Design a protein with these regions (language model features):
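Accessory, non-catalytic peripheral segments of nucleic-acid enzymes
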Residues: 210-243
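N-terminal active-site segment of His-dependent metallophosphoesterases
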Residues: 1-54, 127-137
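Active-site environment of divalent metal-dependent phosphoester hydrolases
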Residues: 1, 39-42, 68-81, 107, ...
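A short helix->loop->beta-strand "cap" motif at the edges of active sites that frequently abuts
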Residues: 28, 62-67, 167-170
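Divalent metal-coordination and catalytic microenvironments
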Residues: 31, 36, 52, 72, ...
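Short, electropositive alpha-helical surface patch
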Residues: 46-61, 84-95, 188-204
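Conserved catalytic scaffold of divalent metal-dependent phosphoesterases
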Residues: 75-164, 192
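Conserved beta-sheet core of the metallophosphoesterase superfamily
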Residues: 152-217
Length: 243
């Protein structure tokens, strides 16, 4: 969020007070990131890079945690190709901790196969569709823009990819949209924290997938960035309630 100190402090609290403590307590050593690691697809400054390294990437190394990450649309410089992307350019010093998924592939997590699909663009669209037809994994993870799902609370996506391509899978886990929602086998996990005002009041989670039972557990992030204050302006003013 434009390297705002307010947002960076908020995100640091999430990682230090919520996310990493939960992983350490439950001995979780593997993260699967479904895309959109960075915010601005065109540029990022040194302040944001330094902050991200200290509060997240260095912690992966310190705690012995690895992360598989799929390209999201915010990670790619161009809209018609994924070739130039922030993940390759900026995470080269963490290759032991970070595995960047550039092409559709099947990963094996403790015996559970998960098909991972990067952001679908004109250049890789046919490759991704062919993969979805032949993939033998029961679960798909991908940053998807599917018609009929909420992008943010109360704002449905009126265009986008048809969900029929995913009908044969047991479970589809996707990011991209900020709102958490589910329809049949497709689960939008939503953002794990608040980024915009339309996130206000919409509970945020990260999720834990049990590779044995295939059960998914949402873990609530209690930290918020935005709050709405309601008051009777015939009796109070904003100044009085803020004091």
């Amino acid at each position: 969020r434009n390297s705002s100190d307010i947002f960076m402090d908020y995100q640091e609290r999430f990682y230090t007070e919520v996310f990493f403590p939960y992983l350490l307590k439950n001995n979780i050593k593997q993260i699967l990131h479904l895309g959109d690691y960075y915010d601005n697809r065109k540029t990022i400054n040194f302040k944001a890079l330094n902050h991200n390294r200290k509060i997240f990437l260095d912690k992966l190394r310190e705690y012995g945690i690895t992360m598989d990450i799929i390209l999201g649309n915010h990670d790619t410089y161009y809209k018609n190709t994924n070739e130039l992307n922030a993940l390759k350019e900026l995470q080269g010093h963490y290759m032991n901790e970070v595995n960047i998924i550039l092409d559709p592939t099947v990963m094996n997590y403790d015996g559970l196969k998960v098909g991972l699909v990067p952001w679908i663009c004109p250049e890789n669209e046919q490759q991704c569709l062919d993969f979805l037809e032949s993939c033998d994994a029961p679960i798909i993870g991908a940053p998807l823009e599917l018609k009929g799902f909420e992008m943010s609370k109360g704002m449905p996506c009126m265009d986008g990819m048809d969900r029929k391509h995913f009908d044969r899978f047991e479970m589809v886990l996707t990011g991209h949209f900020h709102a958490k929602s589910s329809q049949q086998n497709i689960h939008y996990l939503g953002a794990q924290m608040e980024f915009f005002w339309n996130d206000c009041g919409d509970k945020k989670y990260f999720h834990v997938l049990d590779t044995e039972t295939r059960e998914m557990t949402p873990v609530h992030n209690p930290l918020t960035m935005f709050e709405k204050c309601f008051y009777d302006d015939t009796k109070e003013s904003f100044e009085t309630i803020s004091n």
